[in-house]
Design a protein with these regions (language model features):
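Short, solvent-exposed turn/loop segments enriched in Gly/Ser/Thr/Pro and often Arg
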Residues: 21-22, 63-65, 340-347
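Aromatic-rich peripheral "rim/lid" segments of glycoside hydrolase catalytic domains that contact
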Residues: 132-133, 179, 216, 272, ...
Length: 377
């Protein structure tokens, strides 16, 4: 209340307005309207109380960030599409706030994750995560396997290189030089994905096992799957199946010490998605457009109160500065105000030191983006 009085008296001109609730998480009720309605009513009550003392300053109203499953206590961050999580309040000096950290696997990576931006492909709204697969078959060369052609179909428009083993027991499967070749309608061809596992930089996006056994590693120029009493599956990047093109997946593979019935294979797994983007910038722009559509439809201002990428994403050429530049380009081109998260903190900071220290060593790649994108600001 003291802050409200001081802002109303204009004694603290740095106060732009009041952020009501940061990233609100609400209990999940019987439907999304009831769930979001809880947050809307609370935000309205907060605003009404503020307006008893201050009618001049902005109130910043953030959409529902997540819903809590009350039976498990789990916060569900992606259960509902963004356009179902917005709401309006009755106030003529409100700004509607969103935060942006998409793709989270990039912006929130840990040391060693090595997630790059951009990737070859981004997916929005899976319709069928797994439709089927095609395995490479052994050729006349002892350890070399190659699949038949596969193409885009009505049931799938994506594929992912996959390494699979089953019932290895105490044995090991070795994989090397896994390659996807694209054959264009004009007769030309080229490699669109390759992994020789020499430096460990291209890691699987997902590791799955059916019974909790098995493990994988990269060493000596191989990817190795070891042990496992049932299926063990490593899935790499999702890639778009381009219309009119044909594809083959190939690579070297052998099993060592596997019991009878144990085997491994190289394959392509197929998925169906509503939207597939082959440009990181195109993907980011599409995701941001979904967020700001609420403002355009309701003629209210949108503000990105937070966006940022952690310190790891700026190392070793992973592309943190490219992601920030794309977000800032969208905001600048669409007249959206924004705040970068954060100024001074170890994980996301423009000055990424411990906050007990005076900020000295800034993120120079980030500083250059700020200077370039705000040169005319």
């Amino acid at each position: 209340m003291d802050t409200i009085h001081r802002a109303e008296d204009a004694k603290e001109p740095a106060i732009q307005g009041y952020g009501l609730i940061n990233e609100p998480v609400v209990p999940e009720l019987s439907n999304v309207n009831e769930t979001v309605g809880q947050c809307q009513r609370l935000m309205q009550r907060c605003t009404d109380e503020i307006r008893r003392y201050d009618r001049n300053h902005i109130v910043f109203v953030e959409h529902v960030a997540a819903v809590k499953d009350m039976s498990t206590g789990e916060n569900l961050w992606n259960k509902y599409p963004i356009d179902e999580l917005w709401f309006l309040i009755d106030d003529d000096n409100a700004v509607y706030e969103a935060h942006f950290y998409t793709p989270a696997v990039f912006t929130h990576q840990s040391a060693g994750d090595s997630v790059e931006y951009p990737k070859p492909c981004y997916v929005d709204n899976y319709l069928e995560y797994w439709v089927g697969c095609m395995s490479a078959r052994q050729t006349s060369q002892d350890t070399y396997y190659e699949s038949d052609y596969f193409t885009a179909g009505e049931d799938y428009n994506l594929y992912a290189p996959v390494l699979h083993s089953s019932k290895l027991g105490s044995g090991t499967a070795l994989f090397d030089d896994v390659t996807v070749t694209e054959y264009a309608p004009d007769g030309t061809s080229g490699v669109v994905w390759h992994n020789d596992f020499s430096d460990g930089s291209q890691k699987p996006e997902n590791a799955w096992n059916s019974d909790g056994t098995g493990s994988w590693s990269m060493s000596e120029g191989y990817l190795k799957i070891s042990g496992g009493t049932d299926d063990y599956v490593l899935t790499f990047d999702k890639l778009k199946l381009r219309e009119g093109c044909k594809y083959k997946i190939s690579g070297h593979m052998q099993t060592v010490g596997a019991p009878s019935g144990g085997f491994a294979d190289i394959r392509a797994d197929f998925s169906l998605a509503e939207n597939v983007y082959e440009s990181g910038r195109e993907y980011v722009f599409a995701e941001l457009s979904e967020i700001v559509r609420f403002g355009k439809e309701n003629n209210v201002p949108i503000y990105f109160g937070e966006f940022g990428a952690d310190a790891e994403s700026f190392k070793n050429g992973l592309g943190g500065e490219r992601w920030v530049a794309d977000v800032m380009d969208f905001c600048n081109e669409n007249g959206i105000s924004y705040s970068y998260h954060a100024y001074h903190e170890p994980m996301f900071g423009f000055y990424p030191e411990d906050t007990v220290k005076y900020p000295q060593h800034r993120n120079e790649a980030l500083a250059k983006v700020f200077a370039d994108k705000n040169r005319n600001g």
